[in-house]
Amino acid sequence: MLKDLNTNQGLKPWRVESVFYCIVIVLIFIGAFKIAEAVFKPLAISIVLGFLVYPVYTFLARFKVPKFLIVFIIFFLLFSFSYLIFSFVYYSVTVLMKQLPYYQNQLAFIMKDVLSRYKVDSSVINDVNFSGYIYPFLTRAYNEIIGFTSSLVVVFLLLYFLLSEIHVFEMKLDKAFKKPISTRFIGALDTINNQIGKYLGIKILVSCLTGILVFIGLTLFGQDFPLVWAVLSFVFNFIPSIGSILAVFFIVITSLIQFYPNLNIVLYVFIYNTSIQMLIGNILEPKMQGKRLDISPFLLLCFLFFWGWLWGIVGLLISYPFTVIVKVIVDNVSWLKSFSVFLGGSEILSNISHISSKDKEI
């Protein structure tokens, strides 16, 4: 074993040190992101918004629209969207608070009915204060969304300066680095921009379609708050892997509380919403997205949990864009190629096997 390590084929000391330093740097960054959350979270959101609005910026720039007018149009759209979100949150919380006593009584009735079927004393349910659990949850969610809305001023300020310098960024790279390095930088940024811009654009379209279908279906079934669940389905669709599962789960749970003991409608609601998520998420969206960056689904889920732990709901929403950024960076740094292989999905393995088969033929 020691002999192998001393040969040229063994681990080189500088390579081990590089890996160690990388791990230390990553841990320092994680600590900084967690401690200085109030600073880094608006910065991260502004970067993701920058990728989202950049196609609009380039589209209007083709028609020789003045840059100040492009920025004005983009910010008008963003402010309008933010106002709609704030109005929706206020409406949703108000409606939920009004209906909360009904749902509390209905939930108590369901639990008593289930316990009585198993001949268990249900008198203990009378002492349970469900509102004591639900009100803090709604208040916490409301405060988090209001806090996010209030931080939009900082986000928009950062985005403004980002857009004002975006047209000279390539020239800065050419001046700062030599030609091969600057070209590689620009290529990596183009890849990140294309991947994230295309992902977010198509995600908005399919999420809107999902929300519309959810609203129509729940209205026909007679479920309460169809608009609330439609908008939440739209938002949850941006959370990779588990977002659609969470959307269906919350819709079905509230449907069960509302329609119990009529379980047929609950079953119809479950089948309808599951079918929408499967058809759009597994058939329509992959066809629209086409060829995407090859990322391991398992590691994508790990990144999802990591960003969710780090920054909550905002972390869940930005997990995929930042995973793409990490993947493109490790793809373009030679001594990080090993990490790129582990971050890749099944496509990279087929490429490796294809190359090895060609080598055998040669």
Curated annotation (Swiss-Prot):
GO terms under biological process: transmembrane transport
TM spans (from-to): 20-40, 43-63, 68-88, 144-164, 212-232, 234-254, 265-285, 304-326
Main location: membrane
Any single GO CC term annotated in Swiss-Prot or TrEMBL for this entry: plasma membrane
Record's keyword terms, sorted: Cell membrane, Membrane, Transmembrane, Transmembrane helix, Transport
Keyword Membrane: yes
Localization (cell): Cell membrane
InterPro entries xref list: AI-2E-like (IPR002549)
Coiled coil: none
Presence of keyword Membrane: yes
Membrane topology: Multi-pass membrane protein
Family, per entry: Belongs to the autoinducer-2 exporter (AI-2E) (TC 2.A.86) family.
Annotated protein name in UniProt: Putative transport protein BB_0006
